[in-house]
Amino acid sequence: MQNNRPLIAHLCLFFACAFWGLMAPLGKDAMTHGITGIDMVTFRVTGGAILFWLTSLFTPKEHVPRKDLLMLIGAAIFGLVTNQCCYTIGLSITSPINASIVTTSMPIFAMILAAIILKEPITGKKALGVVFGCTGAVILIVTSAAAASSKVGDIRGDLLCLGAQLSFALYLSLFSKLIKRYSVITVNKWMFTYATILILPFTFNHVAGINFAAVPTSTWLETGFVVFFGTYISYILMMVGQHTLRPTVVSIYNYVQPLVSVTVSVLTGIGVFKPTQGLAVILVCLGVWLVTKSKSRADIMREQNAKQQQA
């Protein structure tokens, strides 16, 4: 079982990002038929908190010291509140294509921050993997965009989306050790609880003003998918991956999201597959493989110790 941990971690990250890729079109449709971005963020955070607390009733209890509870507030701020609020508000200001392109910056931030905070080396293979993945993701986004977009990008929205990526990259680097210390359910339970406490005072009146009877059933089903699969299940899967893999490896799976979005659009007949998209898929897969195969700090230290022992 121990030998299968890396494989399980990679599969969990793939499916988490696949759900996020599916969440994008469903969430966007919901936010144009009865609810707003602020409502969606509130539903995700509060819904996640309720689901994780219910799940915790059926899992072993874990004692979390006060110091770590305070640290989890920081994790909630960077991993949930700032990330989700900045991206959702940014998306409402700028164009979807601009927002999608900006999200490709997250693995770059994660690689740089992991080098500064965790002292993870930026190897040639790792840097090349991030470049390949970023290039492939941008090609996917640009080639799948509509020829004529009714919405023009806005620098304010772009900067907010950029801030969301930086926030999540900081979360991956700053709280990597804390996340590994406790179970996935315990960490998420407290993170979503703190996020709810921080967000709800500012969004409650907005959500209370929804005309619930006028919201279509399809919108509630889409919102349900976003809350359950795009939030609850995805955060469980992502943290399983975090328990085993390095922050840069976790972040590189961000490039799977546009891949899934384009695949779904082609399968449903909304989009048309193009040869350039085939190249983009190859680049994304190659990028993920290169980053996964790059040497970690521990690998390099082991090699150095082995050389010293041989000398």
Residue ranges and their predicted role:
Residues M1-F43, S150-K177, I197, P201, ...:
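Glycine-/small-residue-enriched transmembrane alpha-helix faces in small-molecule transporters
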Residues R5-H10, G34-I38, T42, V64-L70, ...:
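Juxtamembrane helix-entry segments on the extracytoplasmic side of multipass membrane proteins
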Residues L11, T42-F43, Q84, N98-S105, ...:
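Helix-helix packing/entry segments at the starts of transmembrane helices
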Residues F19, M23-A24, W53-T103, I139, ...:
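Specific transmembrane alpha-helical segments of multi-pass solute transporters/efflux pumps
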Residues A30, M40, R44, G90, ...:
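Hydrophobic/aromatic residues within transmembrane alpha-helices
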Residues T32-T82, F109, S167-L174, K189-A208, ...:
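Transmembrane alpha-helices of multi-pass small-molecule transport proteins
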Residues F52, I73, L113, K125-S144, ...:
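Hydrophobic transmembrane alpha-helices of multi-pass small-molecule transport proteins
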